[in-house]
């Protein structure tokens, strides 16, 4: 693999040229053959623990892209590139190219050239919070459907758990209400025989089984995180704002009550004999006073202690909560059509279902007339 110096001389108009590799090479291209692209140097538009993100335009195609630059830490396994090369879905940010470069300190950086989206869901929500107006319930519903659609593909087709679902990792276009899942730096293909680290996922969105130290958790941790995202969009602030790992559990118990012995067993059997203060749950209808029964019931199905009782991504998509998006009804139907919301590749996204299950799911997924 070609590793370039990152101090390539700039042209007079600040254009840099790089040899890059296709993430999804066309049939006529050998994946090991680099292609040359050029783009203007630009300023940073985002940063995190992983590194920095630049926005720029590929000169050859006039395509706006984001370039995520990640230090290759030899102590940790970087699965992000290999996982992103596997993925192709309308609601997952597309990896177009990648290249490696070495800096003057001999550090190696992986550069991921990604599809560009205008902002994160976190930024979109902040806009409404600053305006002191709630986000439209219809906009929330569209974002959540697309999130669960991406997770259904990720969990069932790719067998990948994202492990860091939060508003900052959901990119949106506020004009079209399109949503795409990004940042696969924590993602992993979970195997039942292989333990996983429990200290994963940002605190406010951490599933209770992670807080209980489970190492054999499942893709269902992403569903809990998604429920926390939805709650935050409705409330305008995090539902469980813990100040530490244990305080996070306290915040959850304050609303959902003390988990039962059976629920604790499902999360982590090692805590079965642990004595917890007995707290009664608060009805979610009191937490979400402005929401209808259908919304509250849906959140109750997603925010369950027991990962086996928690809805999976496909059950979420089939929930009556989303029926409004499936109506053959003017404006809503147009948004649904434009976002290709109800277009599913049955071999890929629904391929894990038996014929009877597929028939039942299709009745719930596809458009309904009023």
Swiss-Prot record:
BP GO terms, sorted: ascospore formation; cell differentiation; signal transduction
Residue stretches making up the Protein kinase domain: 39-322
Gene3D superfamilies, per database record: Phosphorylase Kinase, domain 1, Transferase(Phosphotransferase) domain 1
Active site (catalytic residues): 164
The keyword Transit peptide is assigned to this record: no
Disulfide bonds: none
One Pfam family matching this protein: Pkinase
Entry-annotated residues carrying Phosphotyrosine: 199
GO molecular function: ATP binding; protein kinase activity; protein serine kinase activity; protein serine/threonine kinase activity; protein serine/threonine/tyrosine kinase activity
Keyword Phosphoprotein: yes
EC numbers for this chain: 2.7.11.1
Catalytic activity: L-seryl-[protein] + ATP = O-phospho-L-seryl-[protein] + ADP + H(+); L-threonyl-[protein] + ATP = O-phospho-L-threonyl-[protein] + ADP + H(+)
Keywords: ATP-binding, Kinase, Nucleotide-binding, Phosphoprotein, Serine/threonine-protein kinase, Transferase
Residues given in the record as ATP binding sites: 45-53, 68
SMART domains named among the record's database cross-references: S_TKc
A cellular-component GO term for this protein: nucleus
Further details from the record: Present with 6990 molecules/cell in log phase SD medium.
Function summary: Serine/threonine protein kinase that is thought to function in regulating kinetochore activity and entry into meiosis. Could phosphorylate IME1.
Family: Belongs to the protein kinase superfamily. CMGC Ser/Thr protein kinase family. GSK-3 subfamily.
Subunit annotation: Interacts with TDA1.
Name of protein: Serine/threonine-protein kinase RIM11/MSD1
Organism this protein belongs to: Saccharomyces cerevisiae (strain ATCC 204508 / S288c)
Gene from which the chain derives: RIM11
